Amino acid sequence: MKQRIIIIGGMGPQASLELHRRMIQQALADGAKYGADFPHIVHLSLPVPDFIANESRRSEALEIIINELKDIAASMDDVIIIACNTAHLLQPDIEQRLNIRITSMVDAAIDYVSRHYKTIRLLASPTTIHTGLYDKPLKAAGVTVLTPDKDEEQALEVIIRAVISDQAIPQSVLDKIPTTTQYEQANAVSYINNCPSSPPVLLGCTELSCAFAEKPNTIDPINILLRYLTIKGVL
């Protein structure tokens, strides 16, 4: 029996669906042909209240996640993943309450970035930025982290909400993110050749992984996590 992968998703659902889709794509790339070749995935797409925008609902969100994990008897034998970067703020409480271990996408990204880069630019939700979820450990590892200004933060929030609701992202909003606009206007080869010193962009929100998938000079925690799981033999 394959090791069970549990995706704690729904925050938002488009992003956790993208993580699930890429897991299946990874299995196909590794030669999966029949049903039994694919990973055993339990995807909990949970209608969790928006505790990211409303901190007062954090306890309510935590209880929903814990109760769902109890219902499926989550244990140390499972590979448990939180599909939302910001929701990793709940990781210590979940692990302590249920005596389980979560395979952290955030930790995997921090480890990768700290080994490969001296400076990065962080694009993420305002909560991820303000809590230092990425900033603090990366800076402690000697990485310079460039964070969005206020206008960029507001634009990122609009982009994240658009992905969650499956709406088109207005070009006027994209134009407020200079780095992504630059990527959009140049192909990968010319951008890398002409701007080799530009710091790479860490997509510190899975909605941004959806919005800017495969853009040049980006670091995608979803892909880092998939490589980690592949190396560990989980996928």
Give short role names for the model-derived ranges.
Residues 1-235:
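Non-catalytic structural scaffold of enzyme domains
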